[in-house]
């Protein structure tokens, strides 16, 4: 995650989309139940829960119990899902559907090795659902080639369910380009089927082909205007294009169709966050959490970020603490960010000792994380412990010797008006990654602050388009009632003009010398 306000982490577009696209549980891609089947399953669950409450025996087939467990897992009721699977395997030892469901439950709870162990015990390896499960495990291990071979061995590969299952598997695992060939298998036969069109739209969106995705989502909405998932898919495509107002509008239509459609609340929340309406973002994140469309640790992290942007440090800290409680002792991709933000909030409340304790606790869990050392250094800088800040940042650079790390440190120095230190960091970042998209603008701006006209010209000419100093001049004049800053900028622009004139005179002198030199040669 990047930073917009020092040094609070925020939802960059890329991070937001990655998280949003991968929050869906594996079950969502596997089950494409019709409304009739959904109704049957709802009745089955009601019977099961009534029998359980009254402690009455109820015999159910293995596939029925697997469906109940799947629904519970989809609702993130993991303990209840496990209870159903345990009960089912007592009644039906080794039942394939229940074993598959057990493996997926382990995947959903990030227990890859346990999922692999269960999958190895399944004997019916020829079954499509078993191949899908084992392919997902291979993809989780990074074995794309092996997964492709296994999926290619599926016999009924041109059936609609197989095409959808394989396509969504590739999409969910971050390989939308691998989904497209499978979808092309069904274009002629299924091109009017809503489920097929929805998969095509989702595939285009996952592959950043949002214009095509929007076209298909609109086609689906024409067919079925009260389908909340189509409106939400459209919203995600607009979000990809940073069209946040359109995202919110599409989400409103989704919620008009289904007021409990939590994913629409999630996309609204992300959009309000990027529109800097943090209060509304918090409301929508809470509704998304209520609708179980987002894991609670993610929800509280996002809510914490919103409160941090509002500079409500206490509520930000409290939500990061809640997120950590939900994670517990498990591994999580957001653990470092939560610790980092929690430490930042504590430092803003003047609780520096606690902030450093958080950093130390975090380093025990993720010792190679540059983010923690960057944050720790910033806290030391707030305490005016410059040497300790530098020590932390040296470790951060060793952990991540990249331009982005140096840019972050440069920004921290800038925040405390330590301009020479900032410039050294940014120039080293420029050396490491000359084509980094944000270094030249940062260096040009820093030279502007330092009134270094030669440096400014050097970096400004690398920008496309270059900074327009007259615009800067007018903007500064509007911001400075007493005119002091305007006078400073006017003087700086005059110096730049003089510098350009000097360069121009030097160029003319060089041209004259070049013209005279051949004549002298001829006279010889």
What do the PLM-derived regions correspond to, one by one?
Residues 88, 121-122, 153-154, 185-186, ...:
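Canonical positions in the second alpha-helix
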Residues 74, 108, 140, 172, ...:
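Register position in tetratricopeptide repeats
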């Amino acid at each position: 995650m990047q930073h917009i306000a020092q040094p609070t982490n925020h939802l960059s577009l890329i991070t937001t989309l990655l998280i949003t696209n991968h929050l869906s549980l594996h079950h969502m891609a596997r089950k494409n139940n019709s409304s009739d089947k959904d109704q049957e399953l709802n009745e089955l669950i009601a019977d099961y829960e009534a029998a359980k409450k009254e402690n009455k025996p109820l015999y159910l087939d293995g596939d029925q119990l697997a469906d109940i467990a799947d629904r519970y897992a989809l609702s993130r009721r993991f303990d209840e899902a496990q209870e159903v699977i345990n009960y089912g395997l007592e009644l039906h030892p080794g039942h394939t559907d229940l074993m598959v469901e057990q493996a997926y439950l382990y995947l959903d709870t990030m227990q890859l090795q346990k999922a692999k162990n269960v999958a190895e015990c399944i004997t019916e390896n020829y079954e499509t659902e078993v191949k899908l499960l084992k392919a997902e495990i291979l993809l989780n291990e990074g074995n794309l080639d092996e997964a492709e071979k296994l999926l290619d061995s599926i016999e009924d590969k041109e059936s609609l369910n197989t095409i959808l299952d394989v396509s969504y598997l590739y999409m969910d695992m971050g390989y939308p380009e691998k989904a497209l060939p499978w979808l092309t298998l069904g274009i002629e036969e299924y091109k009017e089927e809503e489920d097929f069109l929805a998969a095509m739209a989702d595939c285009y969106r996952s592959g950043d082909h949002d214009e095509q995705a929007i076209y298909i989502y609109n086609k689906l909405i024409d067919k079925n205007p009260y389908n909340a998932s189509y409106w939400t898919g459209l919203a995600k495509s607009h979000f990809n294009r940073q069209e946040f107002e359109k995202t919110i509008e599409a989400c409103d239509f989704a919620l008009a169709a289904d007021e409990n459609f939590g994913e629409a609340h999630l996309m609204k929340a992300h959009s309000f966050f990027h529109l800097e309406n943090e209060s509304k973002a918090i409301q929508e994140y809470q509704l998304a959490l209520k609708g179980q469309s987002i894991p609670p640790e993610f929800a509280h992290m996002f809510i914490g970020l919103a409160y941090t942007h509002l500079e409500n440090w206490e509520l930000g800290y409290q939500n990061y603490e809640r997120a950590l409680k939900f994670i517990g002792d498990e591994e999580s991709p957001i653990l470092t960010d939560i610790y980092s933000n929690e430490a930042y909030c504590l430092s803003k409340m003047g609780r520096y000792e606690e902030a450093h304790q958080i950093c130390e606790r975090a380093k025990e869990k993720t010792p190679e994380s540059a983010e923690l050392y960057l944050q720790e250094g910033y806290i030391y800088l707030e305490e005016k412990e410059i040497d300790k800040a530098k020590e932390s940042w040296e470790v951060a650079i060793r952990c991540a010797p990249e331009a982005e790390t140096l840019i972050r440190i440069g920004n921290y120095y800038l925040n405390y008006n330590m301009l020479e230190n900032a410039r050294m960091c940014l120039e080293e970042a420029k050396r490491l990654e000359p084509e980094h998209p944000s270094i030249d603008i940062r260096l040009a701006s820093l030279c502007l602050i330092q009134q270094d006209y030669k440096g400014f010209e050097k970096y400004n000419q690398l920008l496309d388009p270059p900074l327009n100093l007259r615009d800067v001049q007018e903007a500064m004049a509007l911001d400075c009632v007493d005119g002091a800053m305007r006078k400073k900028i006017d003087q700086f622009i005059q110096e730049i003009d003089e510098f350009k004139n000097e360069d121009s005179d030097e160029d003319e002198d060089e041209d004259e010398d070049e013209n005279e030199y051949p004549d002298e040669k001829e006279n010889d």
